[in-house]
Design a protein with these regions (language model features):
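Terminal leader/tail segments of proteins
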Residues: 1-147
């Protein structure tokens, strides 16, 4: 719904762990005006300059807690992501990305929060990849960013 606002301008950058550049990060906004419980956030489809970064490379930081995997986020049933808040999406990429301009392709994987559907238990047991979810966001969005 608010796809033009999915990332915070100027937030795309490399990050370090233990003195080494470990990957890149970007501040993300929820594309749902009501916000949602974190357990419904199932990760992101992330591609930069034609390279896809799978769910296993991603961590999510929100609500003043350390970055967590989306397996951990799936258990945060009582923790909410409010529309006004940005979260930080970390993507492991040893050495980070080169300085300069990049093309970021992004899609949020959000489960629907409007009551129980027949497919919901299957999605909980075998969550589809973010790009394969039939949730709120159906398209990949493209952003020109710079480190």
């Amino acid at each position: 719904m608010f796809d033009a606002y999915l990332i915070k301008d100027g937030s795309f950058q490399n990050y370090e762990e233990n003195g080494e550049t470990a990957g890149f990060k970007v501040d993300v906004h929820i594309g749902e005006y009501r916000g949602c419980f974190l357990s419904l956030v199932r990760g992101y489809y992330v591609e930069v300059d034609g390279v896809e970064y799978p769910l296993e490379t991603q961590k999510f930081e929100i609500n003043n807690k350390a970055p967590r995997t989306f397996e951990e986020i799936a258990k945060a049933a009582w923790e909410h992501w409010d529309y006004d808040d940005y979260a930080t999406l970390y993507v492991a990429c040893p050495g980070g990305l080169a300085k300069g301009k990049h093309r970021l392709c992004l899609m949020q994987g959000l489960m629907t929060q409007y009551g129980w559907q027949a497919h919901d238990q299957e999605w909980i047991d075998n969550t589809p990849l973010p790009r394969e979810m039939a949730g709120k966001q159906q398209e990949v969005y493209y952003f020109d960013v710079e480190i």
